[in-house]
């Protein structure tokens, strides 16, 4: 029997086309603002109706996608905080995984740790995190604390340290540290909170966290990777990697590079921008595919045969392309018995992705 395909969706603004805002307003003049909780809740409800593994929420330190300092008046400008958006939609969803982007370059790992741990608690074990680096001088100037790194490799060295700190902080409370025993007047077992005592080139963090250990123990860490150094970062720091093949040849090459980097344990999702009859003349780091839902299914299953675990679809225009994914593409996969027909109640995101239980590195072995 052929294995089921894993499928997620990547959300950014009104969609991944640079003029998605215009297409959205043309199709739905009364559509909500991207700063509205109702807008994001609606997208999440649609994605969950399609039984998708997870949704990711993009974020950067610039008001528009890309590395330019100047702001184009013709493109959507401004963005909310992805982690806060995920926390907003967690209570109105029940099953779908929530993976926001959070930039590590100018953000303390302590803050990221407690934010993602909180998201995992409020979503009952459905949280993940996609670290991102920031490399431009104008992004560094927003914070006024230091210059941008000249060496991109150093950015990922720092990012690896940041992820390690975050992971240690998630483990700094044992699972049963909270007692809540009114009779003995003990709320917490202090012996089950641990200093992490991390000392590295970029961070020195004592810990423990101020947030109890997340329900998953270790929320899922994902990385978007385009190059060998980032495949190495994913292999050492992540559970899940998003790759960007443009054809079968590049897919085979990337999968080989991920393995060479030590990423045999990673769940590999290929990114694909999809538009169903829309414009394809726009820039993207990932392949842009225009076709019918059946055409997309053929491509996805072909990629699965070549070795990916799943695909993360990026709708060119959320308002028009996401419903086609959910209402037309997913049923085709279901009829082919290649996609789930229901969620499992109480399933965490780690469980859905087939990741192992995350042991606590600080828990002593007790008789």
Model-predicted regions and their roles:
Residues 5-11, 55-57, 96-102, 125-131, ...:
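Hydrophobic faces of well-ordered beta-strands that scaffold small-molecule active sites
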Residues 7, 47, 51, 89, ...:
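Conserved, mostly hydrophobic/aromatic
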Residues 199-202, 209-263:
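Long hydrophobic segments that form regular secondary structure
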Residues 32-47, 112, 223-236, 288-304:
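Short, acidic/polar
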Residues 1-92, 216-219, 365-367:
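N-terminal beta1-alpha1-beta2 module of alpha/beta enzyme domains
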Residues 10-35, 105-195, 240, 249-250, ...:
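Flexible, glycine-rich active-site loops centered on histidine and acidic residues
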Residues 141-147, 151, 162-168, 251-259, ...:
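C-terminal helical cap(s) of enzyme catalytic domains, especially alpha/beta-barrels
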Residues 1-31, 95, 137-143, 192-224, ...:
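N-terminal small/glycine-rich loop or linker at the start of catalytic domains
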């Amino acid at each position: 029997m052929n294995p089921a395909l894993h499928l997620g969706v990547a959300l950014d603004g009104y969609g991944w086309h640079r003029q998605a805002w215009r297409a959205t307003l043309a199709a739905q003049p009364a559509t909500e603002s991207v700063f509205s909780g109702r807008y994001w809740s609606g997208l999440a409800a649609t994605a969950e109706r399609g039984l998708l593994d997870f949704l990711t929420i993009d974020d950067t330190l610039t008001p528009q996608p890309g590395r330019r300092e100047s702001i184009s008046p013709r493109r959507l400008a401004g963005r909310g905080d992805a982690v806060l958006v995920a926390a907003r939609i967690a209570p109105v969803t029940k099953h779908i995984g929530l993976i926001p982007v959070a930039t590590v370059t100018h953000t303390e790992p302590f803050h990221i740790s407690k934010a993602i741990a909180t998201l995992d608690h409020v979503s009952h074990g459905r949280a993940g995190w996609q670290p991102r680096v920031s490399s431009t001088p104008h992004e560094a100037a927003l914070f006024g604390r230091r210059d941008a790194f000249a060496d991109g490799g150093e950015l990922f060295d720092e990012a690896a340290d940041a992820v390690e700190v975050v992971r240690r902080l998630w483990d700094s409370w044992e699972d049963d540290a909270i007692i809540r025993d009114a009779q003995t007047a003990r709320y917490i077992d202090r012996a089950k909170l641990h200093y992490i005592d991390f000392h590295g080139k970029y961070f020195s963090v004592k810990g423990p966290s101020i947030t109890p250990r997340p329900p998953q123990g270790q929320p899922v860490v994902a990385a978007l990777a385009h190059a060998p150094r980032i495949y190495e970062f994913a292999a050492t720091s992540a559970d899940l990697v998003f790759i960007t093949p443009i054809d079968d040849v590049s897919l085979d090459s990337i999968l080989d590079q991920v393995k060479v980097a030590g990423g045999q344990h990673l769940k590999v999702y290929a990114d694909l921008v999809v538009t169903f009859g829309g414009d394809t003349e726009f820039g993207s780091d990932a392949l842009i595919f225009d076709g019918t839902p059946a055409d997309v299914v053929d491509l996805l299953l072909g990629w699965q045969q070549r070795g990916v675990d799943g695909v993360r679809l990026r709708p060119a225009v959320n308002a028009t392309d996401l419903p086609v994914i959910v209402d037309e593409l997913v049923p085709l996969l279901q009829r082919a018995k290649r996609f789930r027909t229901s969620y499992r109640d109480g399933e965490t995101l780690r469980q859905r992705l087939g990741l192992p239980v995350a042991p606590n590195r600080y828990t002593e072995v007790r008789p």
